[in-house]
Regions:
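Sequence/structural signature of beta-propeller domains
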Residues: 2-341
Length: 341
């Protein structure tokens, strides 16, 4: 088989997996996660710059736990600790040490999502929001469109709502992204596209509470891409992760920044967009990128990206760390397109 045919065959397989591949089960309850360092570009190991982002490190994460994988969202806590959720209703806690090891790992099911009367549609968790003051989490689900609230450390479910505005969304194309702004408002972005635009909603407060008002608006991603996750930055900007599957290049990802002014300008049915600051495509390290989080070290900001392996042997759970520039530039260049797989 020629190299070109091999690349095309792999790309077709990856495209199928992106929509939900065949799960590979390893019966184990291990709580150990290992990390193997990866280069950004094996063809050019010295490369560090990707658009406006500076590459710091990348790892392939592995665990023998049967519920590890399928990561769909990522939140950063203090001390390089992270919380991830999978689209199988699992919550994953871990810490990245200074020397690139994983410790303090736990892999456990979300409360209230397992049992004889619960189907996969109930467990299809996609988005994750966090309130650092109360320690509460909010998880969005796209199989049966819902938002669930959890107490500190996911000890118990404390609320459930199925917003009427989301019930007409296509199956498995619901609330892909949820994040909480510093002032307590929430934004939810649906995975589905209509004329290349995402449906989205601004919630005036906790989405679980009946008194919270909703402002529908639309978000336009980069052409050919879909939003998979987003995270507020300390300065009020929003970092957005966008993903695409293309032939023959396979998975690609773009990181964009939404300005505070754009958020302030959200009105009923308004259309907003963000500026692309970096693009990942082959030969750069990239997979089915689904989660994004932010950490800081003094004045330095770091973006962390994580991929969804769809519980298959053909994909990997990749964690990547990039540094944001100290000051936003007036012009944010996009990384040049790289050759395909």
């Amino acid at each position: 088989m020629s190299a070109k045919v091999k690349r095309l065959t792999l790309t077709i397989a990856l495209a199928a997996l992106a929509v939900g591949g065949v799960r590979t089960i390893y019966p184990s309850s291990s709580q150990i996660i290992t990390a193997r360092p990866l280069a950004l570009n094996t063809d050019n190991p010295a490369q560090k710059q990707v658009g406006m982002l500076e590459f710091v490190a990348a790892w392939e994460l592995r665990s023998r736990n049967e519920n590890f994988g399928g990561v769909s969202a990522l939140i950063a806590l203090a001390d390089n600790r992270f919380v991830a959720i999978s689209d199988a209703g699992t919550v994953i806690h871990f810490r990245v040490t200074d020397d690139g090891r994983i410790d303090r790992a736990t892999i456990a099911p979300l409360p209230n999502l397992h049992g004889p009367n619960v189907s996969y549609k109930d467990r299809d968790s996609e988005g994750l929001a966090y309130d650092p003051d109360s320690g509460q989490y909010w998880v969005s689900f796209e199989g049966k469109h819902a938002i669930r609230r959890y107490s500190k450390s996911f000890a118990q479910q404390t609320g459930l709502v199925r917003p009427i505005v989301m019930q007409d969304l296509p199956r498995n194309k619901g609330a892909e992204t949820i994040f909480r702004l510093q002032d307590g408002r929430f934004i939810i972005i649906a995975e589905s596209l209509d004329d290349d635009i995402h449906s989205a909603w601004m919630f005036s407060g906790d989405p679980i509470e009946s008194t919270t008002t909703k402002t529908p608006f639309q978000f336009r991603p980069p052409p050919g891409y879909r939003v998979t996750d987003a995270v507020p930055l300390p300065d009020g900007r929003i970092a957005i992760l966008n993903r695409a599957v293309r032939f023959p290049s396979g998975f690609t990802a773009k990181v964009s920044l939404l300005s505070p002014e754009s958020i302030k300008g959200i009105r009923h049915e308004s259309v907003i967009s963000a500026e692309v600051i970096a693009a990942l495509s082959s030969p750069l390290r990239v997979d089915n990128m689904e989660g994004i989080a932010v950490t800081n070290q003094g004045n330095k900001l770091f973006l962390w990206l994580i991929s969804d392996n769809n519980f298959t042997v053909l994909q990997r759970t990749i964690l990547m760390k990039f540094r944001l520039p100290d000051q936003p530039h007036s012009k944010k260049p996009e990384a040049s397109t790289a050759p395909g797989l």
